[in-house]
């Protein structure tokens, strides 16, 4: 499919279209976190607060979802509310885009799905909570998130709080290395682990300055090296959960999922909801804090990338 034909599926909101026309930096946001990652009304409230943070820093937020047979880039208040309340939105990764677009049903984009749509819309930076990855026990199940393949093929910089701690983070990083995806960190040397700050695994490069991050990313793409760059930043210390506690609760939730025969796309929403229940809601507060922090890091990166692009033109 030609790029023009693919872009014909896009509907940009007025603010996103105006920002793109003016050359203002854009930050893509996923919708799975709204539809499946948090309960209502915290999901919609957090979405509004994250968008406001990005705007305050000088970039334009572009939350992405599939609505009525269109890829919507930038959502209205009513569309955010619809996503947050629905409970029936499909999780949309690469394989699901054709099905949900042709059916016209409501679709919430995953990391992979959002990367594809962001690239079509010309957006270079995407902020999420945590990426998917290699699931524990993948040696037997082959349960590996499509997010990792998308990072290898789609040229979007992804800002996250590491990989979700329910995953095998060591194998996730090994997979990314095999696929040639650079893993950057800021604020610390080690890759983050979602609810907790430190996964115990060292990342490829630490770059704290947004201008340095932008130069790294721009150089990769200038060399014709297609694919994304992953930038990990830890959850703020005040909101982080203790490693021993979250590890034990994660294992308990995983055991429950296995006992109940929960597999595939249903695993992550089940685990997040179960951990929220087991922590009395504290994990949700941590999730909200890390997404907001990621949004700040992502907005600054988008500004730096835009400035670097202007400098190259000059």
Curated annotation (Swiss-Prot):
Position of the signal peptide: none
EC number of the protein: 4.2.1.70
UniProt GO BP: nucleobase catabolic process
Annotated binding of Mn(2+), by residue: 143
A Pfam family: Indigoidine_A
Catalysed reactions, semicolon-separated: D-ribose 5-phosphate + uracil = psi-UMP + H2O
Note accompanying the cofactor annotation: Binds 1 Mn(2+) ion per subunit.
Cofactors that this protein relies on: Mn(2+)
Gene3D superfamilies: Indigoidine synthase domain
Binding locations of substrate: 91, 111, 145-147
Keyword annotations from UniProtKB, A to Z: Glycosidase, Hydrolase, Lyase, Manganese, Metal-binding
InterPro entries per record: Indigdn_synthA-like, PsuG
GO cellular component: cytoplasm
Catalytic residues as annotated in Swiss-Prot or TrEMBL: 30 (proton donor), 164 (nucleophile)
GO molecular function: hydrolase activity, acting on glycosyl bonds; metal ion binding; pseudouridylate synthase activity
Job description of the protein: Catalyzes the reversible cleavage of pseudouridine 5'-phosphate (PsiMP) to ribose 5-phosphate and uracil. Functions biologically in the cleavage direction, as part of a pseudouridine degradation pathway.
Family: Belongs to the pseudouridine-5'-phosphate glycosidase family.
Subunit structure of this chain's protein: Homotrimer.
The protein's name in its UniProt record: Pseudouridine-5'-phosphate glycosidase
Biological source species: Cupriavidus pinatubonensis (strain JMP 134 / LMG 1197) (Cupriavidus necator (strain JMP 134))
């Amino acid at each position: 499919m030609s790029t023009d034909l693919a872009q014909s599926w896009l509907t940009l909101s007025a603010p996103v279209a105006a920002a793109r026309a003016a050359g203002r930096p854009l930050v893509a946001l996923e919708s799975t976190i709204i539809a499946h990652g948090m309960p209502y009304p915290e999901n919609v409230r957090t979405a509004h607060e994250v968008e406001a943070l990005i705007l305050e820093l000088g970039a334009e937020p572009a939350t992405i979802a599939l609505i009525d047979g269109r890829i919507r880039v930038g959502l209205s208040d009513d569309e955010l509310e619809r996503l947050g309340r629905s409970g029936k939105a499909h999780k949309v990764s690469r394989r699901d885009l054709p099905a949900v677009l042709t059916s016209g049903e409501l679709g919430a984009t995953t990391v992979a799905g959002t990367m594809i749509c962001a690239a079509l819309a010309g957006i270079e930076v995407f902020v999420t909570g945590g990426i998917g990855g290699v699931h524990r026990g993948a040696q037997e199940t082959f349960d590996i998130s499509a997010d990792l393949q998308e990072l290898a093929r789609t040229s979007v910089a992804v800002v996250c709080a590491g990989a979700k701690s329910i995953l095998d983070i060591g194998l996730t990083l090994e997979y990314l290395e095999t696929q040639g995806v650079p893993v950057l960190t800021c604020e610390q040397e080690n890759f983050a682990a979602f609810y907790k700050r430190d996964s115990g695994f060292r990342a490829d490069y630490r770059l704290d300055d947004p201008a340095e991050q932008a130069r790294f990313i721009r150089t990769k793409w200038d060399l014709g090296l297609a694919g994304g760059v992953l930038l990990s930043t830890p959850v703020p210390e005040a909101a982080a959960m203790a490693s021993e506690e979250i590890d034990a609760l994660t294992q308990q939730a995983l055991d429950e999922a296995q006992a109940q025969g929960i597999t595939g796309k249903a695993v992550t929403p089940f685990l997040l909801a179960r951990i929220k229940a087991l922590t009395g809601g504290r994990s949700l507060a941590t999730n909200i804090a890390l997404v907001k922090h990621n949004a700040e890091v992502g907005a600054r990166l988008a500004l730096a990338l835009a400035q670097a692009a202007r400098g190259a033109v000059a």
